[in-house]
Every structure is written in C-alpha cells, then in structure tokens.
Amino acid sequence: MRITPVTENLKLGDKVNKKTNHVFVFLEIFAHEGGIQSYIKDIFRAYLRFSQVYKAEVFLLRDSPDSLNPFEDENLKFHYFKNQSPYLGRLQMAAALLKCLLQSRPQQVFCGHINLAVLVQTLCQPLGIPYTVLTYGKEVWEPLKNQERHALTSANRIWTISRYSRDRACLANALNPKIVEMMPCAIDGDKFTPGCKQPELIQKYGLTGAKVLMTVARLWSGDIYKGVDVTIRALPQIAQVFPEVKYLVIGRGDDQPRLAKLAKNLGVSDRVMFAGFVATEELMEHYRLADAYIMPSQEGFGIVYLEAMACGVPVLSGDDDGSADPLQDGKLGWRVPHRSPDAVAAACIEMLQGDDQRCDQEWLREQAIALFGIDAFQQHLQKMLLSSVIDPFKSK
C-alpha cells in the first residue's frame, strides 16, 4: 500500500480557496464501490451541473491521489489522505482540514459518515462553522457511542435518504426529527432504459420461454435481509400458476451455498440461476431480462428498485423499510411482509399477470424518472444547499 505524505495533500504553506462555499469530508469515494459511494458521486455530479457556481474542498481519508476521479474541477478541489497507517492518515487529514477551515471559513461543512462526525464537530464548533452529517442507513440505526451520538445531535442539520432511515436513527439516538432532512438517492435515466431481452443472456442463463424474477444483492451470510431465501420459498406456489417461472439471482457471497441447498430441498433448484457478480455497466442488460424485480428486504432506501423501474420492470419490496420512498408507499410497486413467502408468491403472481398499472413499462419509468431522476436530484440538492445558507443553524 502506498504511503501518501502530507506534502502531497495540503501543505501548511499552501493557499486554499478563499471563496470556498462548502467543505465535504468523506471516508472514501473511489477505493470501493457501494451504495454510499454511488450516492456521493451523484451529489458531485449534480454539484458540477449547477448554473450557480459553487466552490468546494473535498477531503478523502482512504482514497489516494492516483484514484480515477472524474469530478476533478476548478470548483471542486480534492485532497487525498490514504496512508499505510490509518492513524497517521487521519492526523494528516485533521491538520489539513483545520487549516482549510481557518483560512476559508466555508458556509457549511458536510460530514459524509458517522465515523468522521466527532472529528468534524471538534473542528467546526469552536470556529462557529455549521456542519451537516450525511447518513445513509444501517450505520445510524442502532445506538451510537456517546461521542458519536453527541456529534450527531450537535449537527446543524442531518441528511438521510429515506423516512425509514430518519425514524430508525431518531429512535435509536434520541435525535430531533426537525433537523433531519430528506436527500433521497437518484437514478440516471440515460444509464438505465427499457429494451429487449438479449438472446445471448437468455441462452447463457437458460431462460428461453421463461417468466423471469430477478434480484440483485450481495449474498453474505451476515446480511441476509435481502430476502432471496424468502423468494426461493415462494417459488413452488408461483410455479403452480406460472410453470415457466425462473429466478435469476445476481450477486455473490458466502451465503450462496445455503441458498442453493434451500432451492434443492424445495425442489426448485432447476428454477434458480445464480449469475454471480455482474459489472455495473452490464446491469442494465440484466434488468431487461426480468419480468419482475423481487427483493422483499429491509433497505435504507433501495437504489436497485429505481434501476429496475427505470428499465420498465415492475418491483416488489418489503413493507417495513426505506423502500416506501422509491415505491411511493406502494403507488409504484408491490410492498409485502418481507419474511412471508405466501405474500411474496401472491404478489409475484399478480406482477407476472401484468394487469396492474404498476406493470406498465412506460408509465413506471416516467414516474421513477420524474421523482428520482438526475434533474430532480439536482434541483433538490440545490434547494438543500441554499437553505443551509439562509438558515445555517436550523432550529433544534
């Protein structure tokens, strides 16, 4: 692992942008792919599209200067602090961040993870600089350590991606809901579009003539809340009405052997196809294989539902999680008890019959893009940034 010296980041002699509007502090954006990283990239993509020019400094604890960064811009300056010693990297970032705050006095600091909230609070509060903590999901659903909870409750604002995540975080950590604001995920309508099923993929997965249910999920034994096992248990009932049904599971992980054994024990192993890992750029063609996207899970939000809907694929989710937002409380999809195979089976049969408006490909895509497309996301982000300037110390 390459050690990044302080001199490659923000040296004491360097000048920072005196007109800096915002400072963003994240663990990482480019070192790993995931929901949080994708969400942050959407924020920067929208940030650079604003007609009003903002300038920002971005501090990345675990990313290195050789990261492939498409957001480098004169108005978006990045500082990298990946280091062989995590302690030294954090120390370097803290020193550089303090220097930036002292010199540029930004309007608002955005802390991108609860693990950085104590550092941001420690530096911002004595200087009277308001800070916002961005939360994504499970990292704030349980009671936090005292210092982290204090940093969160002391924030001027908290952003989160769904009402469910807001409610879980507030309940677990005694937060005032008034300072928690919704900043939902976005979907790129140009990247995910409807289209024909590719013959090559149909042949590859043995889906000729099949009604295809699909799930995209990590198959980790410590993270079984995606509901793949529940969908497998529902297959025998679905097959009674649709004998041609098959279930395509995209994703990898150590829980696959258990799921494969479950399918075998239920006599549906010939109906379950484990595709393994599929690269992001190939996902759209796989969504197009599906007649229904099925994930009766417990999500903080569920970007995969938006991806499926943008491809015109009807969706099913659990009924007690953050999917209420992308599915608009059931207006755009089916919501069922997430551990009930019977409920999943009944909903899947309705979806495959295709009579419901929520199965209308064009209508479904239209609704998803209007509410969660990049343009809507950009407008919402700009409104949030403006409100942080007008009322930086929102009432607690």
Which residues are covered by each model-predicted region?
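Nucleotide-activated donor-binding/catalytic signature segment of Leloir-type glycosyltransferases, i.e.
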Residues: 250, 257-278
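Acidic donor-binding loop of glycosyltransferase active sites
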Residues: 213, 271, 288-300, 313
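Short hydrophobic beta-strand element within catalytic cores of glycosyltransferases
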Residues: 314-318
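Conserved donor-binding/catalytic core segment of Leloir-type glycosyltransferases
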Residues: 23-25, 207-226, 232-235
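Conserved acidic donor-binding segment of nucleotide-sugar-dependent glycosyltransferases
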Residues: 328-330, 334-341, 350-356
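Short alpha-helical donor nucleotide-sugar binding micro-motif in glycosyltransferases
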Residues: 277-278, 285-290
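Short His-centered aromatic/hydrophobic patch
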Residues: 111-117
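A short, well-ordered alpha-helix in the C-terminal region of glycosyltransferases
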Residues: 244, 357-371
